[in-house]
């Protein structure tokens, strides 16, 4: 199936770093998150803009690249990692006198991006993020990406060695979150790969079972919201073909589904597609990855458009103020500046690529 879907590899090499309490109303607001976080202290688009232009012309007060991390995230409930690759790159360029480049890259370093915990032991990465978020009363976004037979053997192939290893991993993942407020994006690609036939039929039953069990386990954490991945509008073009696979995987017991992870589809395209899919799933809510969709997808051959496409831009900054009652959040799930794979001169999937990160930042208006 290598020629059919706009593939999007994820973290191959990051050991990682990457919540909204399920007691919140389904439409997430920053105020609601903040209130919930206060209770739990024991432990990108301008906010309010419902339809940013495909050109990435969104802006808010945090778009000023000279702002500090604290200022840049004041209107967002999400945690910004002060030790991210982007933050370290900014520091290095400042020392080297590359002031303009450092200023541009703050468009990434001062935004909240998802954490992809390690595949061998997720607990240290999660614990570090939860501690950091608690200090600032913030929510962390995590990605659980370790399903057996992941990615059909392509750039991000791998995953847990077997079903029990995955159950153990998810149990450790959930336990490390504890009572902290968290969003978990569950297994990018896993359900679409069932729907498009890329995952061999002999693995289907096990995958449906594991995804459903993962949702159940994660939802035992009182502050965790779970969104089961549903691909992007340019993959399974007919949302009706995804509805039953998502139901079999347990989406009705999750908080909704996620769209556009690591892809470049515009907000409008994702919202239109998500609204159709939501209608087939009892008005399920969803999130949209806006990390790199400021210019939309690369025109031309879609089979070539998924991997480090040139001329792209950062999208709507992470926010819960989406202007759409079905869209719970715009999130940066793909970490901008990390390679999609060894194409167009890029390093291996998941490796930090400063030049590409700078290109995304410079193309972003505002």
Predicted regions and their residues:
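Extracytoplasmic/secreted envelope proteins and their assembly/folding machinery
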Residues: 123-130, 134, 167-174, 208-215, ...
């Amino acid at each position: 199936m290598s020629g059919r879907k706009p593939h999007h590899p994820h973290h191959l090499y990051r050991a990682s770093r990457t919540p909204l309490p399920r007691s919140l109303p389904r439409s997430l607001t920053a105020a609601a998150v903040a209130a919930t976080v206060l209770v739990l202290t024991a432990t990108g688009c301008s906010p309010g803009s419902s339809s940013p232009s495909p050109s990435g012309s969104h802006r808010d007060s945090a778009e000023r690249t000279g702002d500090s991390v604290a200022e840049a995230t004041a209107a967002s409930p999400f945690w910004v990692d002060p030790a991210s690759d982007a933050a370290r790159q900014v520091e290095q360029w400042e020392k080297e006198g590359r002031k303009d480049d450092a200023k541009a890259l703050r468009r990434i370093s001062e935004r909240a991006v998802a954490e992809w915990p390690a595949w061998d032991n997720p607990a240290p990465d999660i614990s570090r993020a939860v501690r950091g978020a608690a200090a600032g009363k913030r929510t962390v976004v995590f990605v659980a990406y370790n399903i057996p037979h992941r990615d059909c053997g392509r750039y991000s192939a791998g995953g847990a060695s077997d079903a029990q290893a995955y159950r153990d991993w998810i149990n450790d993942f959930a336990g490390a979150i504890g009572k902290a407020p968290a969003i978990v994006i569950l297994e990018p690609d896993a359900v679409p790969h069932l729907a498009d036939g890329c995952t061999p039929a002999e693995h289907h039953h096990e995958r449906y079972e594991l995804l459903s069990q993962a949702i159940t386990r994660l939802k035992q954490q009182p502050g965790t919201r779970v969104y089961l991945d549903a691909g992007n509008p340019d993959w399974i073009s007919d949302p009706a073909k995804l509805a039953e696979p998502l139901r079999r995987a347990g989406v009705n017991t999750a908080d909704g589904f996620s769209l556009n992870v690591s892809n470049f589809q515009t907000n409008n395209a994702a919202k239109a597609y998500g609204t159709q899919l939501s209608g087939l799933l009892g008005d399920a809510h969803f999130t949209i990855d806006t990390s790199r969709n400021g210019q939309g997808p690369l025109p031309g051959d879609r089979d070539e458009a998924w991997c480090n496409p040139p001329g792209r831009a950062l999208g709507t900054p992470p926010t819960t103020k989406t202007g759409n009652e079905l869209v719970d959040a715009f999130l940066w799930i793909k970490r901008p500046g990390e390679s999609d794979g060894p194409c167009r001169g890029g390093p291996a999937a998941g490796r930090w690529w400063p030049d590409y990160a700078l290109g995304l930042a410079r193309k972003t208006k505002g």
